[in-house]
Amino acid sequence: MARAKRVKRDSATNIYRTCKQAGTCPPDVINKVESTTIADKILQYGSAGVFFGGLGISTGKGTGGTTGYVPLGEGPAVRVGNAPTVIRPALVPDTIGPSDIIPVDTLNPVEPTTSSIVPLTDSTGPDLLPGEVETIAEIHPGPTRPPPDTAVTTSTNGSSAVLEVAPEPTPPSRVRVTRTQYHNPSFQVITESTPTTGESSLADHILVTSGTGGQTIGGSTPELIELQDFPSRYSFEIEEPTPPRRTSTPIQRIQNIIRRRGGGLTNRRLVQQVNVENPLFVSRPSRLVQFQFDNPAFEEEVTQIFEQDIDTFNEPPDRDFLDIKTLGRPQYSETPAGYVRVSRLGKRGTIRTRSGTQIGSQVHFYRDLSTINTEDPIELQLLGEHSGDATIVQGPVESTFIDINVDENPLSEDFSAHSDDLLLDEANEDFSGSQLVVGGRRSTSSYTVPRFETTRSGSYYVQDTKGYYVAYPEDRDTSTDIIYPTPDLPVVIIHTFDTSGDFYLHPSLSRKFKRRRKYL
């Protein structure tokens, strides 16, 4: 059965004109034409409390309302097509004419019989320069001081007159001391350090001492409350956590990422596990695969590919790296025992197909790093800085006076010319740290002294070897056994590599034939 074609309904305005009188209009047509939809009601109720007049918010064209669009911060808009607005001045215009400051005299009408010569008259204009300014200076005398009382001493006896003149009092002087300090970021003032001898001030601290003695009567005042000593900024203590931390950033998330990354390498069903004992695996793993020259500027932190012909067999330096085609970059993980493990994933190229594809298994090479033993901490000392107690030495208070007689020379001693005291040995020998060695444990040096054959009287050659040597003369009449060298006889050489039954005669044993020349 064919489905009827849907016919489009007429517009809502035409339907409303025909069905309004009969009262058969659909509800949606009535709401749309009479503006009684939900959206229209929201706008009607909202406009009762909020006024948006002049903004042009409606479904009509965007004209900006009655006043047009007005940019923010400017005056009213200008409509296009209207008559321009005439701007009227705010001030009343003045007439152009002579000023009222200078009077203008009117001239009488000139008659034909009057003379054309105009007499000149001296006129004085207004003085525009300022006049004399009167200056009055008042001098106030300073306060007068009463004269100082001078005491006069008189004497009634007949002695000579002594006049005592008192010094004039010195007026007090005002002294102003200023200090300018510039901030230097590269210089740090040490506010706590031990001063050297003779210093009484250090950095920005000034110590003022008054008096060198004193006596305390009675006991010291006890502390009313318990006081606490605040440590200096140079003294601090490092608290060790319990238990001690194993990593600098103990975050569980980082550990999970490391375990997830290393989980695929430890799968024994898919990857072969090989523990490498050679320490070159950490720094130069390529030297374990093939013999090559080292490049110090190249760091083997990337994946390495080794090109090797499968037809030619090359023995690697390490048998564990046989037929290695690819060796990955290092990966670091943590073992269950807490050690750091360096891992590299390699691939072997054992079998090659006819198409040229090489097939091999995956190998996980790893090496566990050894433990770093922690040594006992060494107490370090600050260089140039000392915190805590400070010692100040005052020279005038703690002085030592030594009475020295200039006429006496303590270094000169009185010894007579023939005194036996000059032969005395005043040095004290101390053998507390000495050791007595008996026997020839020390290695002795052997020197060869050459002897020359001569018919003259005995003369000897002694080599100077920084020591004392005694040369004894020898009797030349005694016979000396001379061992002469053995005659030059050929040596019989036996070659064991010859498996034949015959012997091999050395060329030195063969008979030499002389060549006979034929004379022509």
Swiss-Prot record:
Similarity comment text for this entry: Belongs to the papillomaviridae L2 protein family.
Keyword terms: Capsid protein, Cytoplasmic inwards viral transport, Disulfide bond, DNA-binding, Host endosome, Host Golgi apparatus, Host nucleus, Host-virus interaction, Late protein, Microtubular inwards viral transport, Phosphoprotein, Viral penetration into host nucleus, Virion, Virus entry into host cell
Entry protein name: Minor capsid protein L2
Subcellular location: Virion; Host nucleus; Host early endosome; Host Golgi apparatus
PTM (free text): Highly phosphorylated.
Main subcellular location: virion
One Pfam family recorded for the sequence: Late_protein_L2
Assembly information from the UniProt record: Interacts with major capsid protein L1. Interacts with E2; this interaction inhibits E2 transcriptional activity but not the DNA replication function E2. Interacts with host GADD45GIP1. Interacts with host HSPA8; this interaction is required for L2 nuclear translocation. Interacts with host importins KPNB2 and KPNB3. Forms a complex with importin alpha2-beta1 heterodimers via interaction with the importin alpha2 adapter. Interacts with host DYNLT1; this interaction is essential for virus intracellular transport during entry.
Protein's GO biological process: microtubule-dependent intracellular transport of viral material towards nucleus; symbiont entry into host cell; viral penetration into host nucleus
Annotated function: Minor protein of the capsid that localizes along the inner surface of the virion, within the central cavities beneath the L1 pentamers. Plays a role in capsid stabilization through interaction with the major capsid protein L1. Once the virion enters the host cell, L2 escorts the genomic DNA into the nucleus by promoting escape from the endosomal compartments and traffic through the host Golgi network.
Paired cysteines (S-S): 19-25
Annotated GO CC locations: host cell; host cell endosome; host cell Golgi apparatus; host cell nucleus; viral capsid
Molecular function in Gene Ontology: DNA binding; structural molecule activity
Placement of sequence motif Nuclear localization signal: 1-10, 511-519
Biased composition (Polar residues): 151-160
Disordered as annotated region, ranges: 139-176
